[in-house]
Amino acid sequence: VLRLAVVGIDGSGKSTTTLRVLQVLCRYRTVIKPGRPNLVGDQGRLSPYWEPAGTFFELLFRNVDHTRQRLLIGWTRILFVTYAAFMERWMVRRFKPEVVLTSRCPILDPAIYQEVYYPGLSRRMTLQRRMEMTRLLTRVPPRTGYFFLRTPIPVAMDRILRRIERLYPTSLMHREYWLHLHENPHALQIIAQRFDRALSLARTQYGSGIMEIDTTTRNEEEAAGIITDTIGKLPMEFSEPLLVKV
């Protein structure tokens, strides 16, 4: 199984890019996407799987995020990571896919975002140790490869704010009300730096391949095209710690 992840800071277009890749990839490979939402693709058809869980987490995150309480928000993310890891293991057994593609990494992302939501704990543990702890807790294998959407902070913030205006056009609340706690330039800068380090560790520790895609001027459609073409050329036994920048 090729286990691949599209990663990047908030505002990089991970979710939209991943969805567009899946829509094309399912035409010639069996693919699953565990998470929010769970998706199964085969023979050109992409279908949701166990939708109530996705709805539950959407409502949970929306309500908890508005409390602005770091520990409470952090615990909901731990719950989701545990759930997503379980779904990956279950869906791999159930559907026997050729490709597992996620819009976050169940190992890297929790280790990185701990620094925002649990700064005290993060100061006592290196990023490498946090990654290894997350890998052991989730019980999912390291990713075969990563597609890192490199996005400048101003571009990411602009996309985040435009997303909020699109999702909540009639809201009486100020747009900052809808921002996640880490959706600010300072936090995003820290997250971006940690991704660089985490991906480097993934190459050396897990042998993961990395493709870095500059999304400064590329939209989600263009990034998805690059990713889809690359996956289509990967042999099922691919396992090389390559680093490619486009």
Where do the model's predicted regions map?
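Hydrophobic anchor at the beta1->P-loop junction of P-loop NTPases
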Residues: 6
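P-loop (Walker A) phosphate-binding loop of NTP-binding proteins
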Residues: 9
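Conserved lysine of the Walker
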Residues: 14
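Hydrophobic positions on the alpha1 helix immediately C-terminal to the Walker A/P-loop
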Residues: 17
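Post-Walker A helix-loop "phosphate-sensing" segment adjacent to the P-loop in P-loop NTPases
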Residues: 23-33
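ATP-dependent small-molecule kinase phosphotransfer cores
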Residues: 39-127
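A glycine- and Lys/Arg-enriched "phosphate-lid" helix/loop adjacent to the NTP-binding pocket
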Residues: 108-194
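NTP-dependent small-molecule kinase module
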Residues: 158-246
